[in-house]
Amino acid sequence: MSGYPPSSQGYGYGGNPPPPQPPYGSTGNNPPPYGSSGSNPPPPYGSSASSPYAVPYGAQPAPYGAPPSAPYASLPGDHNKPHKEKPHGASYGSPSPGGYGAHPSSGPSDYGGYGGAPQQSGHGGGYGGAPQQSGHGGGYGAPPPQASYGSPFASLVPSAFPPGTDPNIVACFQAADRDNSGFIDDKELQGALSSYNQSFSIRTVHLLMYLFTNSNVRKIGPKEFTSLFFSLQNWRSIFERFDKDRSGRIDTNELRDALMSLGFSVSPVILDLLVSKFDKSGGRNRAIEYDNFIECCLTVKGLTEKFKEKDTALSGSAIFNYENFMLTVLPFLVA
């Protein structure tokens, strides 16, 4: 051992023991990187377990004009109180940042605080988000509205008649397809059905085309035309079976039984609405004629099938977001 005190720059053989460990969370003499959390990995995107301000991915958007965190059809168990402060720079009564349908903002992330999404001034959404019309724009990686990924309607593709199709159906289609394109449009379909004593309004024809093609292109091919033709024959036989007095109309009770035979059980309230809607007399007869019976069946069938796509457990309940709800209902309103 030398007579000199041990060096403070090292821990040579026989020297003093190393100094105590640095404080929790530090990395020696270097400061921890911004945003680090020690040895624990960062929570996954959208996790709400460790971040009280995080909005789960897929959460319901805030209603137009409401405070950013007002619950629009809140998910079960979501009892958070609405955020009472207005967004930075927003005028009284202005819509929430990002517009209707954007991810709601909440807490310090509105102002770009620690852990918040980077904000942009002026118009435009954040990186990866859909363009915004007002406010600060969407957050980093915010999902754009569903419609931006493409139309929900199916593409209309060429088809052929199924093997063994009735030659009369083939001849009917070919007579309507004057340009030999392999498709017939709404006017041509209306004329083709009239030739078989099936006269329908253009609205009913549009509903038929939508239900059998799942497309908003008002054309139909041989395969879909064949399915449509046989379905109409089936519905006509059902109408005649339940028109027991041969009046050419079916009343509320007969409509209930007819829909039940098609597999649709609707309540008396809905039955009254259907009869009021499709009664040509404006509700005086409280009965539906054949052509409107077809439109009524198309509406009930179409809405039920769209609902069952969401009700995968067949529980009688389903969850729709705003976009899906509008896309489900509007085709039956604007046909």
UniProtKB/Swiss-Prot annotation:
Tagged with keyword Calcium: yes
Domain EF-hand: 164-199, 230-265
Compositionally biased intervals (Gly residues): 110-141
Keywords annotated in UniProt: Calcium, Metal-binding, Repeat
Residues that bind Ca(2+) 1: D177, D179, S181, E188
GO molecular function annotations of the record: calcium ion binding
Chain spans, region Disordered: 1-154
Organism superkingdom: Eukaryota
Binding positions (Ca(2+) 2): D243, D245, S247, R249, E254
Induction: By touch and during darkness conditions.
UniProt-listed Pfam families: EF-hand_5 (PF13202), EF-hand_7 (PF13499)
Coiled-coil portions: none
Listed Low complexity bias regions: 1-10, 46-63
Compositional bias segments (type: Pro residues): 30-45
Function: Potential calcium sensor.
Protein name, UniProt field: Probable calcium-binding protein CML49
